[in-house]
Amino acid sequence: MTKVFINGEFVNEEDAKVSYEDRGYVFGDGIYEYIRAYDGKLFTVKEHFERFLRSAEEIGLDLNYTIEELIELVRRLLKENNVVNGGIYIQATRGAAPRNHSFPTPPVKPVIMAFTKSYDRPYEELEQGVYAITTEDIRWLRCDIKSLNLLGNVLAKEYAVKYNAAEAIQHRGDIVTEGASSNVYAIKDGVIYTHPVNNFILNGITRRVIKWIAEDEQIPFKEEKFTVEFLKSADEVIISSTSAEVMPITKIDGENVQDGQVGTITRQLQQGFEKYIQSHSI
């Protein structure tokens, strides 16, 4: 029987219910995180929950949980559902209250919910690479908050699916920001380029891991803006996320990235990622 955490309890999946007035449902008023499990251990879980609590603070949401309590919560859920390889989705909303755009007065209790999913790693895609398309970034101006407001991302991802691509790489004007559900990197002349951390992108946890790996491997890592043209002229292109890991992009908008093969620096980062799974899972 699959268990779900909701409102402070671990309940059977069919008993996991929220109010129709929940502000996450009617406004998207909430935040979330997705954490990867490898061999029954949680990967970079502390970093995920640091970001979770930062997102909560940015939207004025007091969760009354410590990082340690959140880690124990998802660890128990992982064990309850016998998840060895997979992920844990956790979200928090501002709670249930009569529909009104302003925050409830007085505040109501936030609703925290979490569930698990078992799945294997995307071995074939990591080995061979995937295709991407580019599209205008139509999202709001606080992409640094991991908010439930994902309609812009959903539309971009559906656009990618329509053209048989794995990811939609978004750009504001000529400047590449990030993927619909990933960070984006252009590798040129031995240097890794990615958009700087600001309100236009989410500071991905896997992005941070890639930066750590680059430092360990002495690969230059530059956080600076680059154009779609620069992206398409890169020697290698990758995307990263909790689910996609270090994913090679071998074709963009129907054109090969160089010879259409996975590059040497990408392979170096993938190998480094394997080591980080071992050293940063608890």
From Swiss-Prot:
Keyword Transferase annotated: yes
Identify residues that carry N6-(pyridoxal phosphate)lysine: 146
From the UniProt record, list the coiled-coil ranges: none
A molecular-function term among this protein's GO annotations: pyridoxal phosphate binding
Query: Which EC class is this protein assigned?
Result: transferase
Q: Which cofactor does it need?
A: pyridoxal 5'-phosphate
Highest taxon above the source species: Bacteria
Q: GO cellular component terms?
A: cytosol
Known catalytic reactions: D-alanine + 2-oxoglutarate = D-glutamate + pyruvate
User: What EC numbers are recorded for this enzyme?
Assistant: 2.6.1.21
According to the record's subunit comment, the protein's assembly and interactions are: Homodimer.
Name of the protein this chain belongs to: D-alanine aminotransferase
Q: Upper lineage ranks? A: Bacteria, Bacillati, Bacillota, Bacilli, Bacillales
